[in-house]
Amino acid sequence: MFVSILIPLYNGVEFLKEAITSIRNQTYQQWEVIIGINGHPKNSDTYFQAKLYENHKIRIIEYDTKGKPKTLNKMVEDASYDIICLLDVDDKWLSTKLEKQISLKSKYDVIGTACQYFGTRNDIPKIPLGEVDTRYIFRVNPIINSSCMINKKDSFWNDEFIEDYDMWFRLVFEKKTFYNVPEVLTLHRIHPASHFNNSNHNFLPNLINKWKKKFGV
C-alpha cells in the first residue's frame, strides 16, 4: 500500500529539512510527499528552498487557497494514493511510524500515534492509546494531527472550526474506527510561532455544541 504524505507550507520552511529527513528515514518506503506551498510566489525564498527537495517521490504544488484547511483539501485531491498522512512542516516522525501504522490499516479507519513535544516543551500529551473509545471525543481531541493516517475518501478539513477536531467528530459520527499506536512515533515541535500557541481555541465551545446537537447529547 502506498501512502500520500501531505506537508502544507506557509511558514516554517526552516524546519522542512528535518520533516523531509524523518520521512526519508522511514523503514516503510512506499510513499509520495506533496509539499503544498500557499502564499509564496515562485521568486520567494520559501518556494526556492522547497524546490530543492523535489524529485520523483516529492512533488511541489502551489495553491492559491486561503487558509490551511482549504489547502489541505486541494492537496487531498492531488494525492495519488488512497491513504493520506499529514505532517506539519515543523514536526517529524520516528523511523518506524509508517510501518507500524500500515500494519494496522486493515483494522482501523483512523490511526494515530503517541506523541512527544519538543522545542520549548518536552512533555507527552495525554490522548487515548490503543483502540480509541470514541465516546470520549467530547473530552479530548483523540488524534495528534501530524500522527494521523486516514483514508483519502474520509479526508476533508472544515475551516469553520478547529479543522482536525471537527473531522474526527464527523468520522466518529460516521462510525469510523480509531486507534493510536501506544508508542511515541510523532514529535510535535513547540515554538513561539507554532500552531500550538496560535490556534483559535475560542472556537472549541462552538465545535463541541455543534456535535452535541448532532449526536443528541
Protein language model regions, located:
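Cell-envelope/extracellular polymer assembly enzymes that use nucleotide-activated donors
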Residues: F2-S4, S22, E32, D166
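A conserved hydrophobic helix/loop-capping motif in glycosyltransferases and polysaccharide synthases
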Residues: V3-F15, A19, Q26, G36
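Acidic donor-binding segment of Leloir-type glycosyltransferases
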Residues: I20-E62
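Glycine-rich, basic loop-to-helix element that forms the pyrophosphate-binding segment
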Residues: T46, Y63-A79
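Short aromatic/hydrophobic "clamp" motif used to bind/position activated sugar donors
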Residues: I84
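The conserved acidic donor/metal-binding loop of glycosyltransferases
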Residues: D88-K92
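Conserved donor NDP-sugar-binding/catalytic core segment of glycosyltransferases
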Residues: L98-I124
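Conserved nucleotide-sugar donor-binding catalytic segment
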Residues: V132-F203
